[in-house]
């Protein structure tokens, strides 16, 4: 606990900046499914075209995430912190924290002990470190996959011209242009990861085409599809998969008032279904209302048009 408090003390403010910066630094942390950050993400993807999508999925990330990337992620945060505040007086302490978080073997006086690898599960800082580390891994993968090409193609700046990726912990989604889709895709990426013991879900299990990329319709990131708004082409909806929204209704918790918690979950489910359009929203609402009426409870009053106006308001659109 003390160690977590120390990390928050020295890294908390800069970690918040990572969440604020969003797709500008390839981060999906803090992405608001109903807000303009989704449209901003899709505009980042549009830079190289909404055609050849990447959608990775890791298994056993925590057990195979290299300490090298944990340390590098901390160092990146330290560098950003010192540039922003213009002070290096905490440098030694912050590097010591980074080394402690990155290494399994610790020495204290005459004691030598081993700690669990990686950041603690459930700690908010873990997502920040994993996100930055995942981003760094992608550039290393690019360098390895393009090393045989002439010139400086292997450099990170060249990757940024042809590939746009976004990371949220161990989740990633992205796009690659036609020039490099045969070199940098889910199949070739998984082959590189496998060399280093990273369990990257085989693309064939995700419905990815043989060349290792997929269409916008098949693209899934953070368990969601992305749908362009019918009225305003620069607005995008983040549609959490149907099965996830329906599964939410079966969640069970042993804390608080069960009915209040269920209604909160139903509200989240309805707001999530909004992204799927009016017809599926109404079908979902009607199905829930049938159950509520059967047990003598009042029906839902969620209104698609109200949610639509709120969606447009968040995007700065004025509608009658």
Predicted regions and their residues:
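Active-site and adjacent loop segments of nucleotide-processing enzymes
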Residues: 113, 124, 180-320
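Short glycine-rich loop/turn motifs that provide flexible caps or phosphate-binding loops at active sites
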Residues: 27-29, 121, 222
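A generic structural motif
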Residues: 27-35, 84-97, 152-155, 197-212
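Short, well-ordered alpha-helical packing segments
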Residues: 11, 15, 42, 59, ...
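Short, hydrophobic/amphipathic alpha-helical patches that form generic packing surfaces
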Residues: 1-16, 99, 132-140, 264-276
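Conserved polymerase palm-domain catalytic core
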Residues: 49-167, 174-183, 218
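Active-site-proximal segment of RNA-dependent polymerases
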Residues: 3-63, 139-158
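Beta-rich nucleic-acid/ligand-interaction surfaces
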Residues: 32-37, 158-164, 172-174, 209-210
